Amino acid sequence: MDEEETAEINAQEQEVAGSAGEAAAGPSGAEVQPNDDSVAVERVIDVFEETAEMEAAMIERFFGPSGEVAEEGTLPVPGPSADGEGSANAGGERPSEEDIVLDDGTESDGSYNRPGSDMSLDSPNSEDDSDVEAMPRWMIPQNRLRFAVDMMVSQARNQDGGIAALLNRDNFLQRVRSMVFSQERRRSRNSDEVSPEAEDDELPEHPPPPPPRPPIDIDMEEGVHFDTNLPAEHSYFGPNLNRVPGVNYQEVGSTHHMLIFLHQYILFPGEVLPFMIDGSLFDDDMSGLDGLIFAVAFPLMKPPEDSKKLYGVTCQIYEKGDNGRHLTFYKSRALQRIVINCSDIKGLPQYIARNPTNKCHSKVKILPEYFLPEPLKCIDMGSMSRFRDIPSMRDKYLRYQISSTPWPVEVCQEYAYEDIVERARKKLEVHKIDTMPKCPIQMSFWLVRNLHLTEKMMSQMFLTDSVNLRLQLIGGILKEETLFYCRYCNSSLAYCSDLFAMSKHGVQTQYCNPGGYIHETNTVYRVISHAIGYSGEPSTRFSWFPGYQWHIILCKFCAQHVGWEFKAVEPNLAPKVFYGLAGSSVRIGKAGDSATVNGNNFVVRNMLRVISEGME
């Protein structure tokens, strides 16, 4: 593979890395309108450009060219136009706290004060106001501007449309200034009431995360429980699917020449990968009735010290069907981990979720799975072995075994995994999951997908050849409380403790929409209050969960697509409502993560940058 093809592959990787949750976001392929920060920024800049001439006229009218106040003691508030039309404050009077009302009808409460924020005017960490008097009166100090924008962002959080709707409203600059003057008046009113001791109190750097909520018990809901076998069958592909026999595992360490594709998510052996593709790419390679084995590589999981290799899995097709549009539905299952040398790739590999048109082949090597059984279970103690399965004698028997071996207790426990499996089983009982495999190799991969680890941990698990080490790593994170965060603004969306299985494969499953885009979906009972908004209308077309309608949900802060709400349309179906979070739009993080809890800092920082540029 030459340098030109390598450069094109890297370009595709960057495109996928930056396009998580792209246009084909709905199960039916319905597009979510782009609503990213760049669009909001352009909107704010347009507002400033439209009011540039008005700003200059008002400054000269009220203050004069030098910025001096025309009349001592009066601080005018500019209106939406140079002549003051449409503004209640065109006469130059400063609005009172009670009169400040945002365009969405939300009143500005003068008592707003975000604890621990570095944007607070009364905080010891706020910017120095010593140079405020030296500035022209019509200029807004940076710390007051920051506090006003922070307040507007917090109020917009509880309104439909989120931050994008806030930026798209008219008179944005006027509302920012009104908020500043309202807070200034409140500050002067309360300055005498604040004691010196209170000012010296240090506040926490970040507001605490919302407290965990009590778990929902689906067994208490009335109605017929949803059949978790239905999503696993991917029945939304239609009834015209034919079973393809044959499951072939390749010998460990062997090298094979096979068709390869790229994928934006990490697949572990045992997972099902549904996709839609031009059948002509497979017809020539499928021999008889045996299922085709092909390779799927993960370019976003390149180890930094080994960038010339790609890691992935082999997949075997076990079901296929025609959709009548020159495309073929396929269902495949991941079998074994593989490694690919980039120099062995013949052709340009394409993403399997983007309707590939060209074939690409390469040599792949099957990676091993090393598993060492528990040392004490390998010791045959003759007639005493019968005490191993007696609960009352198990501990005594274990101590006797350890005393008769040359290894210390730590060595024996290092390779013990039954305790880890039991703790994982108890944790997953909350999620109503009872499909844990018994084979240690398959169980290690299954636990990685259902315990919801961070992306870094998942990559580490995939690259580990030792099953024992993989289980030890899993045991180390069982007690950690984790949340789903928006990948774009770090706003907290849902608790991982609210996960539950709507599919027999677990809480995280991959689904395909009619556009061919593959979504990794995490099902949760509920999301954090005021964390989401909605886009478009609900629909039952191509629903991944039969009997439920889907509705696109957006992050309330950044208005980016983060998943779907599923609501039962058939009577007596339980659960009545649940949510599917798109893996491309969310990330897993610890509850005490240093990242922003509610996304305020991210949004405020970008809004302040644009406002500052517009006021220069």
UniProtKB/Swiss-Prot annotation:
Biased segments, Pro residues type: 206-215
Record keyword Translocase present: no
Entry GO CC: nucleus
Pfam families, alphabetized: Yippee-Mis18
Composition bias type Low complexity, residue spans: 11-32
Region (Disordered): 1-39, 63-137, 182-220
Compartments it resides in: Nucleus
Coiled-coil regions, chain positions: none
Record keyword Amino-acid biosynthesis present: no
Compositional bias segments (type: Basic and acidic residues): 183-192
InterPro entries per record: CULT, Lon_prtase_N, Yippee/Mis18/Cereblon
Domain CULT: 481-590
GO molecular function, a single term: metal ion binding
Quaternary structure and partners: Likely a component of a DCX (DDB1-CUL4-X-box) protein ligase complex. May interact with pic/DDB1.
Name of this protein: Protein cereblon
Organism whose genome encodes this protein: Drosophila persimilis
Underlying gene: ohgt
